[in-house]
Structure formats: C-alpha cells, structure tokens
C-alpha cells in the first residue's frame, strides 16, 4: 500500500510516507 499524508496505521501515528 502507498500512503502519503496522515497515516494512523504506523508506529509514528502521524504524517508519514509509506511504500510497501
């Protein structure tokens, strides 16, 4: 999944950019 912006599904629970 590609998430650019607010991502509450990460350990950072903040603005993050994930790819994979």
Curated annotation (Swiss-Prot):
InterPro entries reported for this sequence: ATPase_NBD (IPR043129), Heat_shock_70_CS (IPR018181), Hsp_70_fam (IPR013126)
Post-translational modification: Autophosphorylated.
Keyword NADP included in the entry's annotation: no
Pfam families: HSP70
UniProt entry tagged with the keyword Phosphoprotein: yes
Induction: By stress conditions e.g. heat shock.
Highest taxon above the source species: Bacteria
Keywords associated with the record: ATP-binding, Chaperone, Nucleotide-binding, Phosphoprotein, Stress response
Single GO MF annotation: ATP-dependent protein folding chaperone
Known role: Acts as a chaperone.
Family to which the UniProt record says this protein belongs: Belongs to the heat shock protein 70 family.
Protein name: Chaperone protein DnaK
Organism: Acidithiobacillus ferrooxidans (Thiobacillus ferrooxidans)
Gene expressing this chain: dnaK
């Amino acid at each position: 999944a590609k998430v650019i912006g607010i991502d509450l599904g990460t350990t950072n629970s903040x603005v993050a950019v994930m790819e994979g």
